[in-house]
Swiss-Prot record:
Active-site residue list: E124, D215
Quaternary structure, from the entry: Homodimer.
Name used for this protein in its record: Alpha-amylase
A Gene Ontology biological process term: carbohydrate metabolic process
Entry keyword set: Carbohydrate metabolism, Glycosidase, Hydrolase
Temperature dependence: Optimum temperature is 100 degrees Celsius. Inactive below 40 degrees Celsius. Extremely thermostable.
Activity sensitivity to pH: Optimum pH is 6.5-7.5.
Job description of the protein: Displays a broad range of substrate specificity, with the capacity to hydrolyze carbohydrates as simple as maltotriose.
Molecular function GO labels: alpha-amylase activity; carbohydrate binding
EC number: 3.2.1.1
Family of the protein in this entry: Belongs to the glycosyl hydrolase 57 family.
Substrates-to-products reaction catalysed: Endohydrolysis of (1->4)-alpha-D-glucosidic linkages in polysaccharides containing three or more (1->4)-alpha-linked D-glucose units
Length: 649
């Protein structure tokens, strides 16, 4: 036996909650189904498969033949089911009670197709030591992470061809390291190269094991892989040669643990894969991180010292993207509220799907349809519990928010940030109208002369960013909310707002307002630099009404502007100036139909809020919402009303 190498081959198949149906369909046709069909033809090939809950639900509803074939392969011993949180949460980011329930749901599904699952695929391989207790309590014996985790703990690469034990609070679990070299070989290099590498590991130790476990989408969905993997026959050759090679002993995780013991005890730090430590850093620091890595590579010492190069951790995304943080903290709030409500918890668990909370190579938090799916389920879960009025630091930034509820809406105000309306969620439509992501500089945009100088002057990557995209790029001074108050000089234009060039007098969008609660509403006030703003907001059955009283004591005329950022995402808007007593917008596939209403005829400026982000297909200029601005000349004192109405039809 010492003249062989044990080899565990695993895949992880996942589609985000809320992804488009055509994406599921294409992934199924190009990847999931042909992979499983090919596997069926090679009865000696063994594969550990993890399938995420959103994908399982789609398969059950649309392609039950996949589940049937998977069940058959499990029965004949070819497939081991590896579980995770059912709706693919980052386990470290959700409460312990929710982790246990998420894992229980997936273990029950695995049992329904004939497998008693004992192992966990760790979503995005985000590890923190206290997960050990949760996993053991969930009946899990082993977990799979990257070899980078082990090297970060001080182990050498040569020590990473065995699983180890790790412990926390007296609970012990086995941990398998994924071989990074195999991740880059499979399926991108010829099969000969894979076999050559596996053969090179043989040294007479019969317990030695090489582990490959990576995204199943690499086998057909990633650019160029369908032709390579299926049409040119890579997968068939791989299955054929791996399963017939006398020097390779194919195993499943459970088979390995039945035959061999883990090698010893290790303590892994909080970690994910190496690239995540770059992506999770704030943009300026991520830029420095990339420069540092490149400098080490130029000097030829990166590989030698790589394990000591560490950036951020996954939870840094909640610092990097405040919109993600708010969504996450609302999820934690709802989790506590519905802990004993099984019906509500179904929706809560869906709202924990990880993809919409972060951003790396793929769109993630930048994709409005993924965030909409989170809010849809959060609002459903929240609606099982009546809140009334809540004063609480919802987002954990040290300042109180005020949540007001009526039969149809949740409204959350942030007095510390310009008295803005930071959430306006409809119980009927299951949308948050204020789900608008701010425009931010990302480290892969290249260098920008000034982060807030309006139109971006991008140098390093300007040849890669098409001109028609680059001319629309701007970065925001403030977060994107409703009822944001601006005091700016006369002569300020729509274009100034659109490209963040407006010169704010007094920083009203982010200064703190005082507040008092009213019956069904709130009054917010601020006096600053001789400008006094009072806004009284009341929730009504079909939206909210606000009355503004603004007093200019300076003697100098200015422009007072109220901004409402609305998550209009399915109709592509253009900048423009509107006038009237009513502005009606019908966003059929996102937030639906709504109206802005005024007592008198008003001018309204509008422009689309477009972010620039990277994805697997290149550059994405995505409309996150539309900014509606009501500009009014302020000489001494003005009083006006506006209404946001959820319109029918």
């Amino acid at each position: 036996m010492g003249d062989k190498i044990n080899f565990i081959f695993g895949i992880h198949n996942h589609q985000p909650l809320g992804n488009f149906g055509w994406v599921f369909e294409e992934a199924y046709e190009k990847c999931y189904w042909p992979f499983l069909e090919t596997l069926e033809e090679y009865p000696n090939m063994k594969v550990a498969i993890h399938t995420s809950g959103p994908l399982i639900e789609w398969l059950q509803d649309n392609r039950p033949e996949y589940i049937d074939l998977l069940r058959s392969l499990v029965k004949r011993g070819q497939v081991e089911i590896v579980v995770a949180g059912f709706y693919e949460p980052v386990l470290a980011s959700i409460p312990k009670e929710d982790r246990i329930e998420q894992i229980r749901l997936m273990k029950e599904w695995a049992k329904s197709i004939g497998f008693d699952a004992r192992g966990v695929w760790l979503t995005e391989r985000v590890w923190q030591p206290e997960l050990v207790k949760t996993l053991k309590e969930s009946g899990i014996d082993y977990v799979i992470v990257d070899d980078y985790h082990f090297m970060s703990a001080g182990l050498s690469k040569e020590e990473l061809y065995w699983p180890y034990y790790t412990e926390d609070g007296g609970e012990v679990i086995a941990v398998f390291p994924i071989d990074e070299k195999l991740r880059y070989l499979i399926p991108f290099r010829p099969v000969d190269k894979v076999l050559e590498y596996l053969h090179s590991l043989i040294d007479g130790d019969e317990s030695k094991v090489a582990v490959f476990h990576d995204d199943g989408e690499k086998f057909g969905i990633w650019p160029g892989t369908y032709e390579w993997v299926y049409e040119k026959g890579w997968l068939r050759e791989f299955f054929d040669r791996i399963s017939s090679d006398e020097k390779i002993n194919l195993m499943l995780y459970t088979e390995y643990l039945e035959k061999y013991k883990p090698r010893g005890l290790v303590y892994l730090p909080i970690a994910s894969y190496f690239e995540m430590s770059e992506w999770s850093l704030p943009a300026k620091q991520a830029r420095l991180f990339v420069e540092f890595v490149n400098e080490l590579k130029v000097k030829g010492i990166f590989e030698k010292y790589r394990v000591f190069v560490r950036g951020g951790i996954w939870k840094n995304f909640f610092y990097k993207y405040p919109e993600s943080n708010y969504m996450h903290k609302r999820m934690l709030m709802v989790s506590k509220l519905v802990r004993n409500n099984p019906e509500a918890r179904k929706y809560l668990l869906r709202a924990q799907c990880n993809d919409a909370y972060w951003h790396g190579l793929f769109g993630g938090v930048y994709l409005p349809h993924l965030r909409r799916a989170i809010w849809n389920n959060l609002i459903k879960a929240n609606s099982y519990v009546s809140l009334g009025k809540v004063i609480r630091d919802i987002d954990y930034d040290g300042f109180e928010e005020v949540l007001i509820e009526n039969d149809n809406f949740y409204a959350v105000f942030k007095p510390s940030y310009g008295g803005s309306l930071v959430e306006f969620s409809s119980k009927n439509r299951l949308v948050n109208y204020v789900d608008v992501l701010a425009r931010r500089w990302e480290h892969y945009h290249g260098y920008v002369e000034s982060q807030f100088d309006g139109v971006a002057s991008i140098h390093e990557l300007e040849k890669k960013i098409p001109d028609e995209i680059r001319k629309e790029v701007a970065y925001d001074k403030y977060r994107r909310f409703m009822l944001q108050d601006h005091v700016v000089p006369l002569g300020t234009t729509l274009e100034d707002f659109m490209f963040s060039r407006q010169q704010e007098i007094g920083e009203f969008p982010r200064v703190p307002y005082s507040y008092e609660l009213l019956d069904g509403g709130i009054r917010l006030k601020r006096e600053h630099l001789g400008i006094e703003v009072e806004k009284t907001v009341k929730l009504v059955n079909d939206g909210f009404e606000v009355e503004y009283i603004v007093n200019n004591k300076t003697g100098n005329p200015v422009l007072f502007a109220v901004e409402l950022n609305v998550a209009v995402q399915s109709i592509m808007e253009s900048p423009g100036v509107l006038r009237g007593k009513e502005i009606v917008v019908d966003d059929k596939y996102a937030v639906g139909k709504f109206a802005l209403k005024f007592e008198d005829e008003m001018e309204v400026w509008k422009y689309p809020v477009k972010t620039l982000s990277q994805s697997e297909s290149g550059w994405d200029l995505i409309q996150q919402g539309v900014s509606y601005i009501v500009p009014i000349r302020l000489e001494d004192k003005i009083r006006f009303k506006l209404k946001f109405e959820e319109a029918s039809g």
